[in-house]
Each structure stands twice: as structure tokens, then as C-alpha cells.
Amino acid sequence: MSLEIAYAAMGGDLETVRKRLMTDERIEKFAKIFLQDTSMQTLESALESGDFSEAYRGAHTLKGVSRDLGFTPLFEAACALSDALRLDEAGTPANLAAVPELLPAVRDAYALVVDSIAII
């Protein structure tokens, strides 16, 4: 029951994840492992240091993990940020000006996921 509450709290897609991971025990296991993932920290520190390649990697990884675990709002926010940070051939982010606008949504969604996992 706490899994349903956690996914409802974060606006996640539990039914799709159940099809992918098959058991609630596996979903709980991987959700808790997510708390050890360093993609958000990588993203934040890379943005602070101006390392856009590493920032893109952090956002892209966060996007993939959140998609796989059905953390829908985080996936959507990380997807938009990842697209903005995608580097062109010259190594310039696609839409660097959008990053300050997009980052708060990623932070908020990430915090919500972390808080929701605590319910499990």
C-alpha cells in the first residue's frame, strides 16, 4: 500500500513500472537504490563549475533513471533540461539560456521523489 501512496504523492506511473519490474518488491528495491544515485549531484556541481558536458550527462542519466522507475514529473523536467544542455558539435549547449528556468522544476521534482520514497 505504501508504494501506491508514494507514487501518488510524486505523480508517478506505478502501473507502467509494475509491468516493467513485475513485483512491488523489485520496485521498492530500485526506488530505494535511486536514493544512492548521484546524477542530481553531478548535474548541480557540473552546472556550478560550468562543465556543460558533465551537466548534460547528469541530466541525461537522471532522465533515464526516472523514466525507468516511473517518476514521471522528474522524467519530464529532466528531459527538458537534458534537451537544453545537449551539446552541439562545438560543445555549446542547445539552449543554455533556458537552464536557469528549467533547473528549479528538476530540483522540485527530485525533492518530491526523494520525499515520496521515504514513505515506502
Language-model features: where?
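N-terminal helix initiation/capping motif
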Residues: 6-11
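Short, well-ordered alpha-helical segments
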Residues: 51-56, 66-87
